[in-house]
Amino acid sequence: MEVLTDFPQPASNGISGQIIHAMLTVHHLERSGSQRILWLLEELGVPYTLKRYKRDPLTKLAPPELKAVHPLGKSPVITDGDETIAESGAILEYLVERYGAKAQGDLAGLRPAPGTPEYRQTRFWMHYAEGSLMNWLVMKLVFVTIPTQPMPFFVRPIARQLCAKVQAKLIDPNLATALAYLEAHLDTHAWFAGKQISIADFQMSFAVEAALARGADARQFPRLDAFRARMVARPAYQRALAKGGPVVMS
């Protein structure tokens, strides 16, 4: 585990001038969805300590040390004073509620006003990212990986055939439907909730990265690719990437 204390650049459109009493800690697993937490913190200019954890080289799972932070042993997890918070969506909402109230400029829409179309879009994408889309992306990764694992040579052809059939009949059609839906939505929305970047874009960012890294042809999804380009071009995203490392396992 590596520990790094970061003091992000003061954000001209974030929370410059807001007093931060306690150092927030991000428990960051390499190549995981916790990257979006770093991105939000960099956008807001919130100081934080970054604790980086490496995946098990064989299982690719989180190391057991994370269970000392939270019983589930997963990432992302943050500690902020006496608070320990897990799950990406819950963490993002907490950070915006606590540190994003004074966000200005293009971050002013992080939390759309209740009752607005932008609010309803934000709520939908906050749930859809992990509740639906990431399920298919994780299944895709699992069924691509299984045939590459050690097994008796006579079992490998069966495993390869079975995994290919599951992908063709179940995973790939559902992923195609999901990505087509995202592409159509981004045809009429610059960001997922509307004209301004919102918390929904941070939540959706990892799923978009994963989809484009795991086989979605950017030429078939130009609007999805353009969303990713806008996201990656942001200086705060680049700072988060430099500190957290590559985003997804390919």
Task: List PLM regions with ranges.
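GST-like fold's C-terminal all-alpha helical module
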Residues: 129-233
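Terminal-tail/helix-coil boundary detector
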Residues: 237-250
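Conserved beta-strand edge residues that scaffold enzyme active sites
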Residues: 55-56, 200, 245
